[in-house]
């Protein structure tokens, strides 16, 4: 039976992952992931992290299934850099039984190729929040309503957008950081924008500015302040959702994250 997205969400408490196999581990065929959990969340990125926390706040126990690994910053070389990419950047999980099966590695990004374009997506606890630029731009009302005419932009503007920024800890770049030598290119860009007759804005960004200040002061090795954050941030300055939404959900005792676990099928009970 094929479920629509809406019907799937409505029946989420009755959905089981029929074949949930931790990578490199065996699974118990006599136990469904829903035996002890009322809801299953597939993926731990932005949407999955928010769902886990909101369910926990409602008193609903959930299990978050994530195919990728948990990345914890330890030292200054947890993540690959744009200057020195290595296998940590790539999700490389060959089909079972293939000749390259032994080369499997749960890296940060999976490349999905189509006939005309290839796309990359996060494959880790925290999902895309670890591997995006950290900029949180609020769409203008006309653009938002052209895509979501059935949603209230005023509610999003007054309640939900501010709530997200507060939860993540996102804010525009502070003036003292923008004035530093590390951000001379940004200042040049803003001057060029103004010279062209446009208005340069400073959108909210999901970084811990105090950590970036330490980078600029030379107290810790530079990472975010030199643009090294697309593949994770080795100074831990990026406020990814595993450090806020998902952390709070797990701390409530009502959410469990099961990493290195891939969902292969969804069936209706």
Predicted features along the sequence, with ranges:
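Residue-level marker for well-ordered alpha-helical positions
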Residues: 2, 49, 117, 187, ...
């Amino acid at each position: 039976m094929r479920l629509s997205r809406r019907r799937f969400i409505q029946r989420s408490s009755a959905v089981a992952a029929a074949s949930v196999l931790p990578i490199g581990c065996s699974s118990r065929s006599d136990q469904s992931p829903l035996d002890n959990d009322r809801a299953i969340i597939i993926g731990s990125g932005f949407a999955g992290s928010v769902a886990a926390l909101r369910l926990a706040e409602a008193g609903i126990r959930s299990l978050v299934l994530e195919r990728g690994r948990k990345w914890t910053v330890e030292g200054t070389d947890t993540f690959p850099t744009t200057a020195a990419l290595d296998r940590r950047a790539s999700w490389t999980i060959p089909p079972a039984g293939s000749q390259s099966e032994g080369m499997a590695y749960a890296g940060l990004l999976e490349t999905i190729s189509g006939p005309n374009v290839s796309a990359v997506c996060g494959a880790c606890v925290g999902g895309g929040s670890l591997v995006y630029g950290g900029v949180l731009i609020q769409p203008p009302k006309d653009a938002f309503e052209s895509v979501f005419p059935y949603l209230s932009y005023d509610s999003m503007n007054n309640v939900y957008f501010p709530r997200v920024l507060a939860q993540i800890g996102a804010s525009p770049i502070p003036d003292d950081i923008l004035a530093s030598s590390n951000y001379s290119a940004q200042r040049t860009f803003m001057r060029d924008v103004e010279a062209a007759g446009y208005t340069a804005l400073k959108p909210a960004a999901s970084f811990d500015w105090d950590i970036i200040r330490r980078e600029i002061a030379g107290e810790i090795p530079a990472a975010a302040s030199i643009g090294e954050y697309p593949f994770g941030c080795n100074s831990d300055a990026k406020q990814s959702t595993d450090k806020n939404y998902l952390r709070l959900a797990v701390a409530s005792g009502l959410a469990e994250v099961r990493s290195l676990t891939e969902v292969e099928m969804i069936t209706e009970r």
